[in-house]
Amino acid sequence: MNGKKLPDGGILFDETDDEDDDANLAATDTAEASRSVAGMDWNAGWKNESGLKGMDLIGEFVKHLPNSPGVYRMFNEAGDVLYVGKARSLKKRVGNYAQGRVHSNRIAQMVRFTTHMEFVTTRTETEALLLEANLIKRLRPRFNVLLRDDKSFPYILITADNRAPAIFKHRGARARKGDYFGPFASAGAVGRTINSLQRAFLIRTCTDSVFETRTRPCLLYQIKRCSGPCTHEVSDEGYAELVKEAKDFLSGKSQAVKTAIARQMNEASEDLDFERAAIYRDRLAALSHVQSHQGINPAGIEEADVFAIHHEGGISCIQVFFFRTGQNWGNRAYFPKADPSLPGSEILNAFLAQFYDDKPVPKQILLSETVEEQELLAAALGEKAGHKVTISVPQRGEKKDITDHVLANAREAHGRKLAETSSQARLLKGFAETFNLPYVPRRIEIYDNSHIMGTNAVGGMVVAGPEGFVKNQYRKFNIKSTDITPGDDFGMMREVMTRRFSRLLKEEGKPDRAQTPTPEEAADLPFPAWPDVILIDGGQGQMTAVRAILDELGIRDCVTAIGVAKGVDREAGRERFFADGRSDFSLPPRDPVLYFIQRMRDEAHRFAIGSHRARRKKEMVRNPLDEISGIGPGRKRSLLQHFGTAKAVSRAGLNDLMTVTGISETVARQIYNHFHESGSD
C-alpha cells in the first residue's frame, strides 16, 4: 500500500509511485504457462519421422490442416515456442509460409528454425484472436510482438461491507464488495487522489479490525483527514452523505459536488460560522488539487482508452490515456518488443489484443491510426467484455484533439527512450572494456543485504540490461538460515547466492558461453535468465566467499563476479574493484562507467533496504492470532470485536471463547491451548 501507517491505525497516503509494487513478482513461468494451455486439444497433424524442418515441414503440415479458424504454434528443435498465430482459415494462413514467395528476414528466420508445429481449432475467428493474445502473453514467443512492463493497474476502492465504508488503493481481483474507480496509470496517481479525497470527504482509511476496536478518534481525525465514524464523532447519516459525495465526485459529477460544498460554505459564512466555512473552503481546495493533476478532462469522452503509436529508429512507443466518467485518470507509455521492420499499425494491432487480455475493456477505444483487424478486434473485445466496444480513428473535433495530444506524448516518450537506450548501450560497451569482458553483457545482477543486527535480514537482487533496470526481474531473499550470527554478511551472501544459482541451474541448466550472440542477434533474443556479470557490494572477503560458492556449484566459468568496495571514509568516487585475473583497481572520478556502477549499486541498496523495512514492518504489526491455524480474517475480527485486544483473547477462558460468534468448542480449545502450554482448562 502506497502510504504511511500511523501508530493508531489510520493511513496517510503519499504521492510517490510505488516502484516495487511488482518487483518481487516472478516473470511468467514457462512451465506454468504450459500447464495453462495443456488442457487444450492441440493437434500435431502428423508424426514427423523423417526429420523435416523449415518450409518442407510446413508444406507437409498444411496437408493436415482444416479450413476452419484456429491458432497454431511453431517450435524449434529445443522445444521452445517460436511463434503463435491465429487464422480465419488455418490451411490458407499456414500455407503462406510454405510458398516460395519472398519473406522478411524475420519470417524467413522463423521458418528456417521451425521443426515442429501444432494447431487447435476454435468456433470463430474472434475466439482465435483472444486465444492467440492469451498464449502470446504467457508463452512469450521469440518472433511475436510482445507487450512488456505489463503491470496491473491500481484502482480506488470504496468498500460496501461495513457500516462506515473505507477508501483504499486496490490491485488485482475485485473480490471485496464495494465500488471500484479507475484504472489509474500509477500508484502515485492513486495516492494523490486518495490523499485529496481524505481532505475533501473525511473518509476513513483504517482497516476494519482497527475500526472496530477504536475507543477514541485517531490522529487523522485530529488533523481533519477523517470524520471519526469509529467513535461516532459523525452520525451514520452524515458519514453516508460524505461517502455519497466522494462516489459522485469519482463518478464524474465533480461540478455538482463542488457547487453543493460551495453553497454550504456560503451558508456558514452568512451564519457567521467561520470555522465551519473554513472546513468547506479546505474541502473545495482539496478537490481542486485532484483536478489540477488530471490535465485534460474532455466533456465529450465519458469512458475511453486513447492509444497512439510512434515508430522510429527500431523502437516503438505506444502511449495510452485513460478516461473514465469524463475524467483523466492518467497515462502510461509502453515499449513493446517487435521486429523493427514491422509497420506501426501491425504492432499496435498485436499490442491491443494482449493489453486487454487481463484488463477491463472500456466502451470506446480511440486510435491514432487504423489497424488491420479493427472490426475483428472490436468484436472480440466486445465478446470478452459483455458489452459493445467501438474502435475508431477520430478525424475531427475534440476526440481528434485528444488523440493528437496522446500522439505528441508518444513522440516525446519515444525520444527520451531512444536517448536512454543509446546511452545505456554506450555504458554497457564501456563496462565490458573496463573489465576486459569478452562480450558486452546483456544481463547484470547486483546483490546487497540489509538487516539490523541480523534481524529481519533480507538479500536483494536487482537486474540491469540494454534498456536499463528490469524491475520485473528483481528478487528478494528472506534470510532463512538460523546459523548466521548477527552481522555475518558473508553468511547472508552465501545463502543468497546458493539459493539463486541452485534454482537457476535446476530451471535453466548451464548457459552455453561458447556461442555468444552478435549484437544484432541479441536484439532479437528474449532477455537471458543467466547473468553475464554479478556485482557484489563488498571487497576481497566478499569476493572470496562468492568465488567459493560458484566453485561449489561448478559455474565459476559461467558468470563473471566483480566486487565493489566502498572507498576511504565510504566516499563515493573512490571505490575499489575486485575481479578475477587482475589486481584491485579504481576508476577515474568522472568516468561514466563509474557513475553507471554507482547507480546500479545504489539501486540494489535501495531495493534491499525497502525489502528489509517491509519485512520489519510486517513483523512489528503481526498479530498473535495470525499464528493459530484455522483462524482466518473473519474469526479474528469476531474475537477482537468481542475481547478488544489480542492480549485479552490470550487471557480468556475456554467458556468465554466459546461465547464468541463463529467459535466452536474445537476452535476455542485450539485457541486456548495455543496460549496455555499446559493445554488444560
Swiss-Prot record:
Region (Disordered), start-end ranges: 1-23
Highest taxon, organism lineage: Bacteria
Major subcellular site: cytoplasm
Pfam family, one: GIY-YIG
GO CC terms: cytoplasm; excinuclease repair complex
Stretches with biased composition (Acidic residues): 14-23
Domain UVR: 255-290
Keyword DNA repair included in the entry's annotation: yes
GO BP term, example: SOS response
GO molecular function: DNA binding; excinuclease ABC activity
Family according to the record: Belongs to the UvrC family.
Protein name as annotated: UvrABC system protein C
